[in-house]
Amino acid sequence: MILAEGLHAVRALHERFPRVPIVADLKTMDGGYLEVELMARAGASWCVVMGVAHPATIAACVAAGRAYGVGIMGDVLAAPDKPATARLLQDLGAEVIIVHTGYDERRQVIGASPWDDLASVVAAVDIPVQAVGGLTLADLPKLPAAGAPLVVVGAPLVIDNDSFRASESDDERLGRVIREVVRAVKAQR
């Protein structure tokens, strides 16, 4: 049921914003081909597979991505050896690596962040890297210089840090952060 409802959301976003890339952050662990196929048919541009999934699942996601013109992002969340997992994802055909420090992990390991693994993962692969989870607005403009040019601006702006409730939005702050990130990305070219 959750997958089916997600399809409705992806389809609606694609219809409303046909030129905007849509990432289906499924965190796929099994059923890789089917999940990517379904999301691709709904209008997703990218799908996310977990690096701790079986290599057959990762390969199935990549095969479906190629068949349907969808990019595959590999997430190293919970991998015991993040650089090795990132290399495996790259070798199996993922096009982007996500260095992700999860919400629960950050609650248990105070201070944990993608910065802990970012340099070693960037050094391990030849494909773009994105950092997610526990980043602050001040971190975002620094990511491109650290080898993570794909910046996600989301949770720090719209979700309260200690709960999944909406935070107060500040359009001026959002505009400033986006301008800083764009400058940082352009400086890396």
What does each model-identified segment do?
Residues 4-5, 31, 138, 160:
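Surface-exposed loop/turn and secondary-structure junction residues enriched for glycine/proline
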Residues 1-3, 20-29, 45-56, 71-79, ...:
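Catalytic beta/alpha-barrel core
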Residues 16-19, 41-46, 66-71, 91-96, ...:
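Glycine-enriched alpha-helix->loop->beta-strand junction motifs that scaffold or abut catalytic
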Residues 83-99, 108-130, 135-138:
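Short loop-to-alpha-helix "cap/lid" segments that border enzyme active sites
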Residues 6-9, 34-37, 59-62, 85-87, ...:
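Short secondary-structure transition/capping segments
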Residues 44-56, 97-108, 146-177:
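Glycine-rich phosphate-binding active-site loops on the catalytic face of alpha/beta enzymes
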Residues 31-42, 80-92, 124, 135-153:
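Catalytic cores of alpha/beta
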Residues 3-27, 61-78, 112-134, 170-189:
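Alpha-helix-loop-beta-strand connector modules within alpha/beta enzyme cores
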